[in-house]
């Protein structure tokens, strides 16, 4: 799974441990709770009447708390002529609300000493923050305002769009990043899995404030959303606070595209000026949940997971053919 962290502007692959499998709770009519004894030690879960699922792990030895809100609003859900919208929207969500200007919002987050950010991936959008444990209530209040009442001001949209367009140009100028985009597009031809999080210059330039709001209204709903908390916090108090802040939230996002591609073997070359050549090969990999998933993950790590991997030792150290070589996997594309 490829994820783009807007806080650090870096590309990384999410591990299986970071993934939360969502269960459809749109038909729930009452809240339900699961204690840590029914799950793993120190874990708890609560489902609110509106379908919002909350999970948590108490870690009393820590002085901080990290929480994240994951929504069923991924890159695959973007309209074909609005590629890059989810990335732009997740940046815009922090640019002021109906109750706080962008300056007020920024100052309040800074007063908390919060590290916050957003991520966009094929299947979801995620917002997260790390704060001192005794400031969780205030941080949740800010995030509720951000998610439920975004202002999406035009002036900030123009600035965020310019930043995203610059990032697109920068990515196209970096051969290593570009080759991953190219193999993804060729392997997943005519599938939402082929999309780039940043979109294209043409589509990003065309996205309007109304487009952002329409997508937010269509897909930012509690049913299918997961709120997770880990660190030094009181579970019961957190459940009560989340219920106060998000209890009036309603609705469910429409079903996402699920059609899988059927890639065919091919070879393609894109000439580019420069002294380096970049080669990438892509193969089918067992999906997360497949009986062979973990075995394939281990094999991939042995084959190309670091400086002790077989690829590194044979191709770089022994033969001196390359500067860098690696193997990796993405369980959902």
Give the predicted meaning of each segment.
Residues 2-31, 43, 47, 55-58, ...:
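Charge-rich, well-structured scaffold segments of protease-associated domains
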Residues 57-59, 68-70, 254-309:
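His/Glu-based metal-binding/catalytic segments typifying zinc-dependent metallopeptidases
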Residues 44, 65, 125, 277-281:
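Short beta-strand micro-motifs in enzyme catalytic cores
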Residues 61, 66-130, 306-321:
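M16/MPP (pitrilysin/insulinase) zinc-metallopeptidase core fold and M16-derived inactive scaffolds
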Residues 36-38:
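Short loop/turn motifs at secondary-structure junctions and domain boundaries
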């Amino acid at each position: 799974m490829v994820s783009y962290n807007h806080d650090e502007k870096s590309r990384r692959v999410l591990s299986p441990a970071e993934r939360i499998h969502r269960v459809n709770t749109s038909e729930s009519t009452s809240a339900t709770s699961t204690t840590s004894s029914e799950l793993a030690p120190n874990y708890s879960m609560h489902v609110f009447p509106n379908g919002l699922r909350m999970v948590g792990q108490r870690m009393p030895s820590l002085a901080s708390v990290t929480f994240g809100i994951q929504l069923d609003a991924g890159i695959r859900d973007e309209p074909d002529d609005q590629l890059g919208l989810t990335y732009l929207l997740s940046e815009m969500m922090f640019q002021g609300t109906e109750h706080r200007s962008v300056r007020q919002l920024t100052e309040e987050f800074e007063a908390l000493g919060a590290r916050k950010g957003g991520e966009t991936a094929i299947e979801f959008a995620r917002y997260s923050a790390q704060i001192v444990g005794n400031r969780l209530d205030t941080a949740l209040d800010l995030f509720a305002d951000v998610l439920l009442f975004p202002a999406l001001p035009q002036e900030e949209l123009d600035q965020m769009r310019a930043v995203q367009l610059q990032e697109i140009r920068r990515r196209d100028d970096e051969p290593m990043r570009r080759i991953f985009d190219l193999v993804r597009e060729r392997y997943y031809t005519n599938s939402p899995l082929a999309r780039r999080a940043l979109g294209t210059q043409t589509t990003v330039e065309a996205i309007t404030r109304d487009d952002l709001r329409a997508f937010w209204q269509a897909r930012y709903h509690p049913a299918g959303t997961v709120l997770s908390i880990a660190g030094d916090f009181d579970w019961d108090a957190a459940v009560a606070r989340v219920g106060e802040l998000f209890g009036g939230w309603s609705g469910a996002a429409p079903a996402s595209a699920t059609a899988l591609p059927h890639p065919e073997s091919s070879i393609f070359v894109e000439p580019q000026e420069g002294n380096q050549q970049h080669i990438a090969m892509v193969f089918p990999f067992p999906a997360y949940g497949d009986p062979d998933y973990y075995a394939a993950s281990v094999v991939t790590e042995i084959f190309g997971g670091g400086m002790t991997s077989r690829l590194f030792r044979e191709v770089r150290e022994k033969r001196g053919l390359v500067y860098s070589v690696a193997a990796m996997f993405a369980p959902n594309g």
